[in-house]
Amino acid sequence: KLHVLHGLIEMKSYDEVEKYIAYLKDDYHEKIGYISESIKVPAVAGFLLAKVREAKQKGISLLIDSDSMLLNKEGLDELYNELLIILGVLIDNSMESISGENDGKIIVYLYLNTEENILLCKVYDNGCGISKDKLENVFERGYSTKGENRGYGLNAVDTIVKKYNGLIDVESEVGKTTFTIELPIEEE
């Protein structure tokens, strides 16, 4: 992008420079800017930006739901750090389930409900899905349908959810999966 700007400046095409900068600004806001507007926790916003780029390199569309709102509330640093683990596992698993699929899509929804003191996290994908007979085992340590030395991520997510006396729900069928996690937050 800088090469384009440099070239346009060297050619003294200043009107084109202006147009290109406007395009970049709109493109940035459309694809990335909304993350920093709705996700106010810097570590989580940065992590999601990195995952959006990683997904794009794999041909997958990773979107943050436009209704997401994660405020940077004081005293929740540990919870936010554990949210990074949860998001990492769920997004990585989603990317693996989509691998090779056309029009792969992942949608992440995060919401800190300060009235009910709940952090809500949803991750949806249109990957291969999880069959009903395997759903009951996905949180067991070491259980995996992907081979040996796997099956620790969802167990870690389950451990975090239990630590906070939260809830985790999985809805899956062929072609789509949604993980929904509710984590109660302590009032200060």
Q: Where are these predicted regions, by residue range?
A:
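Short beta-strand/loop element within the Bergerat-fold HATPase_c
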Residues: K105-E116
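Conserved short strand/loop->alpha-helix "switch" segment adjacent to the catalytic nucleotide/phosphoryl-transfer site
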Residues: I64-I86
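Acidic ATP/Mg2+-coordinating residue in the GHKL
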Residues: D125
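Detector for a conserved hydrophobic position within an alpha-helical segment of the HATPase_c
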Residues: I160-K162
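Short conserved segment of the HATPase_c
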Residues: I130-R141
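Conserved ATP-binding N-box helix of the HATPase_c
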Residues: K1-I9, L79-N102
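Short beta-to-alpha transition helix within the HATPase_c
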Residues: K19-A22, D26, E37-K58
